[in-house]
Every structure is written in structure tokens, then in C-alpha cells.
């Protein structure tokens, strides 16, 4: 069972809460998000079910925090599971940091990896609101597919066209 979980960006905290509930009592989550207000929306629910002690919330930009932690050695743990749901243009940067922090045989999961099916659509057919994230997601998929250090399993969960 995973004990250490790293979460990048979480909106209102629903999946953060469900993950905290699933972790053992001594499980730890490092949650990084530049929007404290979003965390505060879910905080009363996190407190109500008694899992606040599992969550270390960091109100900041994930790239700079992780670079600092890796450089200064302030992050003295390996993670069993990393979930990235952040700015799509930085997914490859997040991957490079995550690979240094996740245990051997650990899991790194990315949200929107199929980007509502747009990654296999002709560019002209992609709705405008999906265009901004489409190219970085395609680049990440190519990057991961060519990386011999990892195994890939893609699962579509509610990310449908």
C-alpha cells in the first residue's frame, strides 16, 4: 500500500481528500498548488474526516519548490505515487523531477494524458479550448514512449471526447 504521495495541483481537493482517506494512518501527502484558496475550499471536509495530519500543503509554484527541495536536499523522502495535474507545458519538467523522487516500481500518473481525445485528432478538428494543452500533451506522450527507464500504461478515466 502506498504511504507517500506527491500531488501537483488539486483544484478543490476532492481527489486529495479521497487519497488521504485511502492512505494508511501514517501516510503522507505533499500537495503543491499555487492557489491556497482552492485548498481552503476542501479543507473543512479534510478536517471533518480527520485526515489533515496526512497532508503537507505547500502554497507555491511546483517547479520552483521541487527544484529547491531537490537542490537543498530538504525533501528527504521517496514517493510511492506521484500525481501530476498541473500546467500542461511543464509536464516534461514535472516528469524529470518526479523520476528523481519516486521509488523504484513507484507510479507517476498524469491527468488529461489523452486530452479529451484531441491527441489523436487532426489539428484542424480540435476545438479551440483544447489547442493550448494539446501540443504539450502530445510531446509528453512521445517523450514517455521513448524513455527506456519507464513502463507506460494509459487508462482513460472520464477524459472522453
Describe each region flagged by the PLM.
Residues 1-161:
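S-adenosylmethionine/decaboxylated-SAM
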